[in-house]
């Protein structure tokens, strides 16, 4: 009898334990937050009313900051669409992603992204607008990957300016939301194509903005009506992103889902203007970032001074979802979850080890001989930006005779080029398009526009050497091919479009392949020295 009683008791304990584990598993499943990732296309840090900007109004972004966290030092490691978004998805630096380090590239199937990992972990995933790209993402069998989830692009709406997409992003999100079952965790990528160019010139003023609202024009551009109009047209498109974000937040709130959702709002890199997008200066890589998640973040209205970068987002999303391992879909991640910041209290510097970020680039847009890129690596701290240009003999924004193709066409670009051609001014041209020395050093605490290169100053040699050594140490830990003497591999990787291959040589021989992102007048009549 005693033995039977013991066996019965043991059986009950086993059954209880199994049921308890089932209940805990179910509880964990229900507790996992929904995830909304809201990413603009070419939106610079500081251009939100939460940051004190007077000429861009962003009530939705401001709400996230007010009810969550606002970051002052968030960065993309690579300021171009495809490599920046690849970094977000994988949690790895672009120089760790082989072909995906480049722009308009194939995305190697061995590098899975967080949306694919969330899907495998029980999340329903979808996106509207722009996901990853430009490029192609296929699995090992050649089938398209759902790299940012299922596409929701059907709803259209007439925008208030002709340069803005007709995509009704918020309505497309609502379609996705209507398909979800109660208790089912989901992750949605809301990606606008705004404020990417082109713009309707003068739309900012037409819609009520004034040129004198802009309190500061960067020192590397001419301060005139053309520049200010261009900036206000950009502002209208930032506000379009924010308007749809506001509609999405309202929809979640109406359905009682907002507080159960981890919301992250940011941009892939800086604004599509000369010397910003596609470069490696402070304004190129510095991005806005606000995060709201009442169930997972301690306190609200906190302003964070820690240096964080896009490699940190994927590990954050996986930790929030209770996914302990990125594999086998994802490779090991280089970033660090933001949960140390989430679980702390107060503002300012939370983790003293988050005191620097790495930046860099390889091949972006076409237009140089031999399909060359313009390789850079750099390191940024609260005081300093150090940059190493590996090929200073090359043109940083692309060759002049092929239209400076790594800089989008714009009224501002046109006036800078025309000022040089007419002999009126070369200052902005030199800063935006001219060749650069091998090393650059800027005291960004005092010179955020990166106007005064201190690299050749004997007074600052110790600073340059210290930062270069620290950068190289970090890059060696990443097994960066540039640090291993194998940097040429990046220029050998294929394009996804045959029309891009040997563009420079074909153009110089008389072909005229399509280059719709620049203006015909961007092309110089002859090569420049």
Model-derived regions: residue spans:
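Bacterial N-terminal signal peptides
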Residues: 7-18
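Formylglycine-dependent sulfatase
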Residues: 4, 22-440, 448-469, 473, ...
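Short, charged, surface-exposed hinge/linker loops at domain edges
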Residues: 483-498
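Short, low-complexity interaction segments enriched in Ser/Thr/Pro/Gly
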Residues: 1, 15-16, 358
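Short arginine-rich
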Residues: 475-479
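Short, basic/polar N-terminal leader/transit segment immediately after the initiator methionine
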Residues: 3-8, 491-495
């Amino acid at each position: 009898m005693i033995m039977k009683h013991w066996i019965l008791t043991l059986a009950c304990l086993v059954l209880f334990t199994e049921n308890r584990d089932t209940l805990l598993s179910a509880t964990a499943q229900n507790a996992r937050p929904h995830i909304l990732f809201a990413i603009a296309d070419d939106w610079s840090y500081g251009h939100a009313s939460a940051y004190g900007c007077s000429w861009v109004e962003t009530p939705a972004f401001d709400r996230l900051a007010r009810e969550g966290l606002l970051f002052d030092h968030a960065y993309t490691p690579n300021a171009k669409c495809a490599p920046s978004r690849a970094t977000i998805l994988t949690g790895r630096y672009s120089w760790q992603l082989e072909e995906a380090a480049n722009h308009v590239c194939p995305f190697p199937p061995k590098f899975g992204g967080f949306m694919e990992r969330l899907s495998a972990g029980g999340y329903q995933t979808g996106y509207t607008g722009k996901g990853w790209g430009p490029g192609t993402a296929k699995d090992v069998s050649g089938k398209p990957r759902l790299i940012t989830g299922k596409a929701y692009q059907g709803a259209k709406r007439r925008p208030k300016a002709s340069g803005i997409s007709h995509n009704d992003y918020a309505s497309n999100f609502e379609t996705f939301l209507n398909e979800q079952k109660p208790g089912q965790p989901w992750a949605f990528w809301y990606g606008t194509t705004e404020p990417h160019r082109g713009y309707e010139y003068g739309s900012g003023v037409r819609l009520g903005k004034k040129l004198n609202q802009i309190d500061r024009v960067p020192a590397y551009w001419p301060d005139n009506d053309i520049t200010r109009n261009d900036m206000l047209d950009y502002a209208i498109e930032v506000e379009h992103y924010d308007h749809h974000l506001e509609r999405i937040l309202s929809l979640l709130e109406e359905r009682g889902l907002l507080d159960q959702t981890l919301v992250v709002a940011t941009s892939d890199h800086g604004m599509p203007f000369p010397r910003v997008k596609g470069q490696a200066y402070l304004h190129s890589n510095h991005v806005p970032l606000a995060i709201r998640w009442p169930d997972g973040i301690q306190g609200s209205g906190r302003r964070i001074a820690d240096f964080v970068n896009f490699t940190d987002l994927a590990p954050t999303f996986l930790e929030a979802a209770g996914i302990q391992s990125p594999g086998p879909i994802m490779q090991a991640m280089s970033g660090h979850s933001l949960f140390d910041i989430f679980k702390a209290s107060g503002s300012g510097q939370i983790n003293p080890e988050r005191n620097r970020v790495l930046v860099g680039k390889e091949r972006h847009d076409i237009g140089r001989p031999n399909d060359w890129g313009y390789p850079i690596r750099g390191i940024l701290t609260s005081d300093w930006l150090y940059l190493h240009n590996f090929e200073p003999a090359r043109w940083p924004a692309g060759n002049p005779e092929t239209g400076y193709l790594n800089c989008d066409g714009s009224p501002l670009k046109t006036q800078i080029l025309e000022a040089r051609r007419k002999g009126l001014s070369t200052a902005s041209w030199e800063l935006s398009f001219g060749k650069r020395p091998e090393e650059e050093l800027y005291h960004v605490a005092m010179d955020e526009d990166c106007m005064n290169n201190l690299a050749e100053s004997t007074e600052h040699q110790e600073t340059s050497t210290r930062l270069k050594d620290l950068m190289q140490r970090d890059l060696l830990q990443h097994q960066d091919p540039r640090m291993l003497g194998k940097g040429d591999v990046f220029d050998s990787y294929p394009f996804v479009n045959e029309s891009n291959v040997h563009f420079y040589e074909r153009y110089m021989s008389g072909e005229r392949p399509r280059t719709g992102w620049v203006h015909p007048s961007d092309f110089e009549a002859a090569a420049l020295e």
